[in-house]
Structure formats: C-alpha cells, structure tokens
Swiss-Prot record:
Protein name (Swiss-Prot/TrEMBL): Small ribosomal subunit protein uS17
Family annotation (SUPFAM superfamilies): Nucleic acid-binding proteins
BP-aspect Gene Ontology terms: translation
Signal peptide span: none
Subunit structure and binding partners: Part of the 30S ribosomal subunit.
Matching InterPro entries: NA-bd_OB-fold, Ribosomal_uS17, Ribosomal_uS17_bact/chlr
Protein family according to the UniProt entry: Belongs to the universal ribosomal protein uS17 family.
Annotated function: One of the primary rRNA binding proteins, it binds specifically to the 5'-end of 16S ribosomal RNA.
Gene: rpsQ
Organism: Pseudomonas aeruginosa (strain ATCC 15692 / DSM 22644 / CIP 104116 / JCM 14847 / LMG 12228 / 1C / PRS 101 / PAO1)
Highest taxon listed in the record's lineage: Bacteria
Database matches in PANTHER family: 40S RIBOSOMAL PROTEIN S11 FAMILY MEMBER, SMALL RIBOSOMAL SUBUNIT PROTEIN US17M
Listed GO MF terms: rRNA binding; structural constituent of ribosome
Amino acid sequence: MAEAQKTVRTLTGRVVSDKMDKTVTVLIERRVKHPIYGKYVKRSTKLHAHDESNQCRIGDLVTIRETRPLAKTKAWTLVDIVERAVEV
C-alpha cells in the first residue's frame, strides 16, 4: 500500500522567549486582507518550538518545521537560525 507523501510545513518567525529549557517561543506574523474593508492587517501566532541545543536567543529570526507532538503545547522543531539578533 503506497502512502501519499506528506508536505512538511515550515514557517519563519522571530524568537520572543528563550526562558524554557530546550524550548523557544516563536512569533509568526502574517498579513491578511480584511474581508469587508479590504485593508491588510497584521495577524500573529505564537508557537513553541523544540531547540535541542539551546542555541537561540531573543530576537533571532528562525525557521521551524512541524513535527510530532513533543509536549502539550509543543509540536514544532527548530530547523535553522536565519539571522542572529544584534548584541546590545
């Protein structure tokens, strides 16, 4: 029985919290057109992602992909760090 190939969902977002062990909170922003007024508005989603080596810092731009559930609220894992945050 041949299985259909699953499409891997990947998203890019900004790390807003790295206080948990091996977990980061990633803010995903998207623009949606308002159904009545036609204006584009920003919508955002916060996702928890698995960071095995604790390498992410707040402000990093990262790519994450969907995986099996790792915890109650964590079903995404870190793929790579696109851009490092500027050190202050």
